């Protein structure tokens, strides 16, 4: 990834994108043979080889070695640039988001104006920062990263640079709620990756995630879950753990939406067990917390929700859950709804639906808001969001009848399907808010303790336990 000679940097970057670690090491040895003084260059290429192999433990050890070796030498600044780049990838892979900020800030501060590595590495770092920003719903930062990428003066027009820019562009469009456009960019980027053999560290996991979210937004749940499974497989293979847990959470949510709460909480429990078994430090515990929060809100477990809300980052869903718990407690303020942001399509549709629900007793007002929301849904592909507004189905149907189009008639059909699905769930005794005793049982089930032990602890018979289940 480092270019000892200016003409070689594109070739070296392709080696890195294609996981050709042996060739990187051989190139480093060739550099050393041509010029025995270029020890630092050879060592950095060896570090990058560890990195593109996704051997992050080996890469971290190599970072320590070469930082120690070249401290207080003429090569120290160059080595520091290379190791901060490496640590950015390592910290992201391990989900160390706090340390990731430190390594990225150092790299950007020391390489933005006078890069010590070639400029493609600058875009690489920005892509990592964009991925972290998307995971944490830091959408303003994500947008500024993309702006910096497209304004950055690069020295060549190679496909791998376009690939980096497209990765972030797709994420930005998704953050805006422009799922149709985001999916188009992500699909093209996936094709670039296939055509050029980009794997390992540069695998198109972020673009696949955008495609999965776009499918989910379009109410294509089966397609979305298939992509999420592919992401989990690829993330495991290349040790990209944030992506694994982000994708896994949607399996839990899918079970929860089907009222399969035991299965949903079992996935959350397995996530926590997997994280606890890692032999490296990380900042990923918030992901199963978020996944559990989603399950808890469906059963109105306000007490457990509050515990989770107190310890998770302030993601978009977290803000929505806080507002929901206030509503359940009888706190409804029109000021809160009217002050909701509405710059992007994602923000606009959420605000319109929220206002439609607030004015549900004033039907004509609610229908007008919902009609506007449906127009945005058609253009952006935010179908599933509308289909999950169970309390507003009557308002949605009246909005559809206001001015039926092909899309709105399609939405009417999907609403009817959801009503039938909900009726089927109700015939099975779901979804009814759980009693306090049932909630207590569910809380214990999420800990992984055997049912017999829970029965004994709560002084509940096994038959009663089965009834609660």
What do the predicted segments below correspond to?
Residues 115, 197, 279, 300, ...:
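Short coil/turn linking the two alpha-helices of tandem helical-hairpin repeats
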Residues 15, 50, 91, 133, ...:
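Residue at a conserved register position within TPR or TPR-like alpha-solenoid repeats
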Residues 352-419:
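General nucleic-acid-binding
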Residues 2-6, 34-45, 73-86, 113-128, ...:
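Alpha-solenoid helical repeat architecture
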Residues 1-71, 90-102, 133-140, 144, ...:
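Inter-helical turn/loop elements of alpha-helical hairpins
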Residues 422-468:
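Helix-turn-helix DNA-binding segment
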Residues 24, 31, 59, 65-66, ...:
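Tetratricopeptide repeat
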Residues 62, 126-133, 145, 162-173, ...:
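TPR/Sel1-like alpha-solenoid repeat signature
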């Amino acid at each position: 990834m480092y270019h000892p000679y200016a003409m070689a940097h594109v070739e070296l970057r392709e080696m890195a994108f294609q996981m050709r670690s042996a060739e990187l090491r051989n190139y480093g040895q060739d550099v050393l043979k041509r010029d025995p003084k270029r020890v630092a260059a050879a060592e950095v290429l060896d570090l990058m080889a560890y990195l593109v192999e996704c051997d992050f433990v080996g890469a971290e050890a190599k970072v320590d070695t070469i930082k120690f070796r070249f401290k207080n030498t003429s090569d120290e600044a160059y080595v520091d640039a290379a190791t901060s780049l490496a640590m950015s990838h390592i910290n992201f892979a391990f989900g160390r988001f706090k340390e990731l900020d430190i390594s990225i800030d150092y790299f950007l501060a020391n390489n933005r104006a006078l890069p010590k590595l070639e400029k493609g590495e600058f875009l690489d770092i920005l892509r990592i920062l964009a991925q972290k920003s998307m995971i944490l719903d830091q959408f303003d930062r994500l947008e500024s990263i993309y702006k910096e990428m497209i304004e950055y003066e690069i020295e060549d027009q190679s496909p791998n640079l376009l690939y980096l820019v497209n990765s972030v562009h797709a994420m930005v469009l998704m953050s805006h709620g422009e799922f149709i456009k985001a999916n188009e960019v992500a699909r093209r980027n996936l094709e670039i990756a296939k055509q050029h053999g980009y794997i390992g560290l540069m695998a198109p996991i972020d673009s696949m995630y955008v495609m999965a979210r776009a499918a989910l937004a379009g109410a294509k749940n089966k397609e979305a879950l298939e992509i999420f499974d592919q992401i989990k497989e690829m993330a495991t293979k290349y040790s990209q753990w944030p992506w694994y847990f982000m994708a896994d959470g949607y399996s839990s949510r899918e079970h929860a939406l089907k009222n399969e709460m035991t299965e949903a909480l079992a996935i959350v429990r397995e996530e926590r067990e997997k994280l606890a078994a890692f032999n490296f430090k990380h900042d990923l515990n918030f992901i199963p917390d978020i996944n559990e929060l989603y399950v808890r809100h469906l059963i109105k477990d306000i007490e457990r929700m509050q515990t989770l809300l107190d310890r998770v980052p302030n993601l978009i869903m977290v803000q929505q859950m806080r507002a929901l718990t206030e509503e359940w407690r009888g706190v409804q303020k029109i000021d809160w709804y009217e002050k909701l942001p509405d710059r992007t399509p994602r923000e606009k549709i959420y605000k319109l639906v929220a206002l439609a629900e607030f004015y549900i007793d004033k039907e004509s007002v609610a229908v007008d808001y919902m009609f506007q929301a449906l127009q945005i849904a058609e253009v952006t592909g935010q179908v599933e969001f509308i289909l999950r507004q169970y309390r507003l189905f009557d308002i949605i149907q009246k909005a559809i009848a206001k001015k039926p189009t092909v899309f709105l008639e399609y939405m009417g059909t999907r609403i009817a399907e959801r009503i039938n699905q909900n009726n089927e769930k109700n015939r099975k005794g779901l979804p009814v808010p759980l009693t306090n005793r049932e909630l207590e049982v569910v809380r214990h089930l999420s800990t992984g303790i055997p049912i017999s032990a829970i029965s004994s602890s709560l002084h509940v018979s096994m038959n009663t336990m089965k009834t609660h289940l």
